[in-house]
Amino acid sequence: MNPRRKKRLALVVGLIGGVAAVASLLLYALNTNLNLFYTPTEIAHGKADTGIKPEVGQRIRVGGMVTVGSMIRDPNSLHVEFAVHDAGGGEVIVTYDDLLPDLFREGQGIVAQGVLTEDGKLQASEVLAKHDENYMPPEVAEAMGKNHEKLEYTETQKGGSR
């Protein structure tokens, strides 16, 4: 092989190696920042189409309705623990150590982002509450299906205080 061909071959091999290195670093960075959405049922039983369950320590987002009567607040700190359920009957306990959104309440649709712990709880770093009675994150709406019912108000409630 003459020297000119050797140079071209080395250049092509170097370019391919560089592209492979950049692609692998990019995939690694995306993998560490990727948050997959799960419903409480999918955490327990795996995704319906693949059966894949989230791993302990994996960053995930969980969406569903806050179970009425499940909220436990620590009186000495901001720590709060509550259950989130979905239409499939699944339930996951969420722990959170910060201020909850103003719109947060039991029976409310929420999305919590955090890390799955060994005991099956979600240690949330962020909790998002829906904006009004008409809004629901698309993932939660799909997961909840037809079981999400709009609140019904009486005529007295609709009129407000006069």
From Swiss-Prot:
Listed InterPro entries: CcmE (IPR004329), CcmE-like_sf (IPR036127), NA-bd_OB-fold (IPR012340)
Keyword Ion transport among record annotations: no
Q: Name one GO molecular function term.
A: metal ion binding
Keyword hit for Heme: yes
One matching Pfam family is CcmE
User: For this chain's UniProt record, which GO biological process terms are given?
Assistant: cytochrome complex assembly
Q: Where does heme bind?
A: 131, 135
Taxonomically, the superkingdom here is: Bacteria
**Signal peptide interval:** none
Q: Mind telling me which Gene3D superfamilies this protein's record contains?
A: Nucleic acid-binding proteins
Q: How does it sit in the membrane?
A: Single-pass type II membrane protein
GO cellular component: a single term: plasma membrane
Q: What UniProt keywords are attached to this protein's entry?
A: Cell inner membrane, Cell membrane, Cytochrome c-type biogenesis, Heme, Iron, Membrane, Metal-binding, Signal-anchor, Transmembrane, Transmembrane helix
| TM region(s), chain numbering | 9-29
Topology check: give the Cytoplasmic ranges: 1-8
Periplasmic topology ranges: 30-162
Localisation: Cell inner membrane
Write out the similarity annotation: Belongs to the CcmE/CycJ family.
Q: What does this protein do?
A: Heme chaperone required for the biogenesis of c-type cytochromes. Transiently binds heme delivered by CcmC and transfers the heme to apo-cytochromes in a process facilitated by CcmF and CcmH.
The record's listing under HAMAP family reads: CcmE
Name of the protein in its database record: Cytochrome c-type biogenesis protein CcmE
Protein's organism: Shewanella amazonensis (strain ATCC BAA-1098 / SB2B)
* Gene of this entry: ccmE
